[in-house]
Amino acid sequence: MQPSTPKRSKGDWSTTQQRRSYSTPSALIFGSPEDTPASSSSFASSSSTGTTPNTSPQRPSQLPKSPSSPTPSRRGLRGKLASLTLGAAERVRSISGRIDDREPPVYAPPAQPLANPQESLMGWMVERNNGGTRPQQRHPPPRLDTSNYGVSAISNNGLLTPEQTPESSPIQPIHRAKGRTTSYYQTQPFKYTSSLREDPFIDRNRNRIKEVQELDFEEFNNSEDDFCLSETDVHSEFSSSADSTSSQCHKALRIPEILYNILSHVEADVQVPHEPPPQRRRPLSLRHAFLIYGDREKAHQAWERALKEEQTPTQQMFKGDGALHGCLLVNKFWFEVSRKLLYNKLHFCDSQKWRQFVHMSSDTGSPEDLITWSRSSHHRSLSRSTGQPNLHQLANGEAEMNDYFDTPTKLFVLHKISNAQQSEIDLLQHKIGGALEWLEFYTCAAIVPPLGLLAGGSLQKIVLPGCTKVDDAFLKLVAENCPRLQIADLRACEKVSNEGLVALAGKCPQLKLLNVGRTQMGHLISYRGISAIARKTQVNTLGAAGCFVCDKSMWELAWYRGHSLDRLSLNGCTLLTNDSIPRILPYTSNLAVLELRGCTQITDFKSIIKFKRYQERHKREPLIEGCEIFESRMREAEFQLEMDISREILRDCVQWIYAPDHDQESVRVKRKKVVPNFASTSRLSFIPHGSDAARKLAATSTRVESSSRHHSSRPSH
């Protein structure tokens, strides 16, 4: 049954067409655009004469079925027209403020929707929440403040798809991601005019955003090149037009500097792959664990944990690895800013991703040309230019988008990429190097950093543990090109000798951490290299495990860097004796970690124990580690030290007991001179019976017993 349309008075909104002209969707009523009347008078005449409009067979009408009357009246046609234009016209009337205070009429919705909504981000959210397509609104929305809105805002408030604009609404196909079926969402032409003044500022910004977002993500998905984004499923809701993006996101997110700062905080949560230093090294045996912890239960737990870690290598998980990768799929403007942050810090812990990156870089020629590797010829040229624009120029379309790489790479980390080749590093050296501050190849035995990665003079941290190709020639190259070097981790680089350390100490005065520990070829590092590091650098952390470090080199280190030393790792330095470590500890007041595993010639542990207790009294707990022999000697030395302290306390008590009694100076009692017998079971058996000392002890014991009875008689709270 066709719902009846309420009568309208002269003040109703239908009479306002004399003041405002609405270009109605006449194609839905009259068929093809050729049959559309030129004015409302022809429309009235055709309806009054009863002529039926010519309907195009290629485009079926989406109107509800006409009533049984063969000649519809003007009122009925107006009701149908109002039901069609309700979604957008009611919004225009609510914004312009030309609606009477009367209650708006209620119209029945059409029998079928006007058009299928485009699969945009908003449409997807509505469909997910409501379980269907976006419903037609039957009542006008509340009034909106028009001070901050222009025509673009009004057009998006209507029932328009993201492809529609106030000027035109073409029927555009929407291609899904690679591997999915292609679907088309058809929209009907809709156009209207408004008496509101258009804001030129909004139009200018909209045109600029359009210019940045001309290119579609379809090019990336259809490309045959092997690239990390080629297999990414890019949904259609993330590739909407400029009008849809500008209407859904906040204005602040369209400002390049603000967006860059926001994404910088996202990037700050990403953990760089690294090997965290252990709080304590694993015990060598169960007895060693018992000597360390002093408790059987803790010792068993530590030993079981050590066995488990030895059998199953740890897989370090780094959180936030894909945080910025999701930002790449928002829109093209976010893609450019996110990519800039990703290239600022390059780190890989997966061999497959590293291979893809090398393949992409070799195909495009440089990481800056990442956007051009899949462009087709009909798009505008994005060739690399000499100037480097800022983000404002990128957003406004005043410069080429591939020149975004104004911030060079500062971090380059390869974490356990054992199959990395030297040819790959040589290919990327001039594209990544030049401004590196952190360079790390962790257990990459087959590669060594080339000169291009060391150039620029900004390198501060170089970590190359397990790189067997690092030698003295490489250290001389580092010394010449990295004057600001502060951290040099060269563990298991067994070709490094004193010559390389001397060159490094002469050109890198800011060096604070040096680790040249090794298990083989320890004779290459001796007094000459350690002495040069101690004299010419600011080293506070030294790792020389397995090296031929002697007592003289330790005195050099204590003399020049004593109070600045923080960590000393001397495991396996068999040349160290009691003439070095026990004697230099008073000069190293800030020492926090001391590792002496395998230093079997050190037997004077009293000085080490006194140093440890001195640090603990000042609320500093140093970590002193050793092997099983070292720990057993430490425990024995601690017991002997406790016995010595007990003897001193007892000796002081005996001296106080035999001191002259000032209260009874007139009474002189001949005291028997005795020597305390600590081997006796009774420590007071040597005191003569009936002497002043015995009376003092009896009085003292009486006072102690009375005080204990007094405390025991007090009620407990």
Curated annotation (Swiss-Prot):
Residues 1-26 have a biased composition (Polar residues). Transmembrane segments: none annotated. Residues 1-149, 697-717 are annotated as: Disordered. Negative regulator of the mitotic exit network (MEN), required for multiple cell cycle checkpoints. Required for daughter cell separation and chromosome stability. Involved in copper sensitivity. It comes from the Eukaryota. It is found in: Cytoplasm; Nucleus. InterPro entries: Leu-rich_rpt_Cys-con_subtyp (IPR006553), LRR_dom_sf (IPR032675). The keyword Transmembrane does not apply. One of its GO terms (cellular component) is nucleus. Belongs to the AMN1 family. The lineage of its organism: Eukaryota, Fungi, Dikarya, Ascomycota, Saccharomycotina. Keywords: Cell cycle, Cell division, Cytoplasm, Mitosis, Nucleus. One of its GO terms (biological process) is cell division. Residues 90-104 have a biased composition (Basic and acidic residues). This is Antagonist of mitotic exit network protein 1. Gene3D superfamilies: Ribonuclease Inhibitor. The keyword Flavoprotein does not apply.
